[in-house]
A protein has these predicted regions:
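Membrane-embedded alpha-helical bundles of multi-pass transporters/translocases
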Residues: 1-391
Length: 391
């Protein structure tokens, strides 16, 4: 149930919003000053709020159809399908909150204030942990699942509240502006540039996440537990990816955008080179560590309750396959930044679409022999192809 809103979080919160928004607003700030950049931020925030509200209403109404699309294998079990629909309806409001939070965080990053957005994942984790502690002794799994799903949306609300508070602390003047406001006409060109960048940024930055979604769809047709094995393996793999890849790209984009606006080619190239070196130096040891200790890591994190030794083994196999793509996943996060800083949307999207098609082909070939592990192998191979072409 958390897979769909979590996909939105990773697509928007971990790259796309930064890639589309920062180059545009950096240009406005450089040319016209902070007051005008605040105004443009308010325009985009107001527009996104209305769009997300409409999306939320539509998604809540048509959630059964959405679940059929992302988990077609669940339709064979009516109880599992109904439960997934109910839980997805509770978690989906998180999408509304996290997309607005990501936009506000991108603006704070432009101003060099990274701490506020960096703390938002902690809010999500603490809210979930708090909910689990409350229902620790509750035996009814359905009740626990419902409240746990609801806690995700509550966490999203707290995250948005925190980031708006951070905006005020940074003296950013956020206003809700209607479409009749003259500012919409005055900034028509910049709004168009942002929208032109956003769709390619989602695909360019989110190839890994979209590939994982495809993996999950195919995994729903495999034996019970296959989706969970991939999900838990991805959660472990996300730790170094989040700490390194996302952190580096988040810090690099505002700096690189500024260098591009100032036409400082030497400094721009130096920033890119240092980021690539840093990513490789830390991702390769992480790969080796996860490969050698995958079973021990999964055992330590998950081997309790209904998570059996067999589950541990099958999850560790998926983690081993995914970890081989770790340096590539991190390099992609870094390598797409120069393209978006230069407002080049075509190259990343072409490479990402090619890698997604390759991933799908490999999935269909490997799933028969290696089941869920074959899906993880396909994701890693396609990531390396993506990174090498971008390089």
């Amino acid at each position: 149930s958390f897979k769909l809103p979590n996909l939105f979080r990773r697509l928007f919160g971990e790259g796309a919003m930064n890639s589309a928004f920062i180059p545009v607003i950096s240009g406005i700030k450089s040319k016209f000053g902070k007051n005008k950049s605040d105004e443009f931020f308010s325009l985009i925030f107001s527009s996104l709020l209305i769009f997300l509200l409409i999306l939320l209403i539509i998604a809540e109404i048509f959630m059964p159809f959405i679940v059929k699309l992302i988990a077609p294998g669940f339709t064979d079990d009516s109880n599992k399908f109904i439960l997934t629909v109910d839980l997805s309806r509770l978690t989906f409001p998180f999408v509304f909150f996290i997309c607005l939070t990501s936009l506000a965080g991108a603006y704070l990053n432009t101003l060099g204030r990274f701490a506020a957005m960096a703390l938002t994942p902690i809010i999500l984790n603490l809210t979930i942990i708090f909910c689990l502690l409350i229902f620790l002794r509750t035996n009814d799994k359905v009740i626990v699942s419902n409240y746990l799903s609801l806690s995700i949306s509550v966490a999203g609300f707290i995250q948005l509240s925190w980031i708006i508070f951070s905006l005020k602390r940074s003296s950013i003047n956020l206003k809700f502006l209607s479409f009749q406001n003259p500012a919409f006409k005055n900034r028509k060109k910049e709004i168009k540039n942002f929208l032109i960048l956003l769709a390619p940024a989602i695909i360019g930055n989110g190839a890994y996440q979209i590939n994982l979604l495809i993996d999950m769809i195919l995994a729903s047709t495999l034996p019970d537990g296959s989706i969970s094995y991939l999900y838990f393996a991805d959660r472990v793999n996300q730790l170094p990816l989040g700490v390194l890849g996302i952190a580096i790209s988040t810090a690099l984009l505002p700096i690189l955008s500024q260098h591009v606006k100032e036409r400082n080619v030497i400094e721009a190239n130096a920033s890119i080179s240092e980021s690539i070196k840093f990513g490789i130096y830390f991702s390769v040891p992480a790969l080796v560590g996860i490969f050698l200790l995958s079973n021990q890591i999964i055992s330590f994190l998950f081997l309790r309750g209904e998570f059996s030794l067999e589950d541990t083994k099958l999850t560790s196999f998926a983690l081993t396959a995914l970890c081989f793509g770790l340096p590539a996943f991190i390099l992609i996060k870094i390598l797409v930044v120069p393209f978006f800083a230069n407002e080049d949307t075509k190259t990343p999207i072409k490479v990402s679409v090619f890698s997604m098609l390759l991933n799908l082909i490999l999935n269909l070939i490997l799933i028969k022999e290696f089941l869920h592990v074959g899906l993880a192998i396909a994701t890693s191979v396609s990531a390396w192809v993506n990174a090498l072409i971008l390089f």
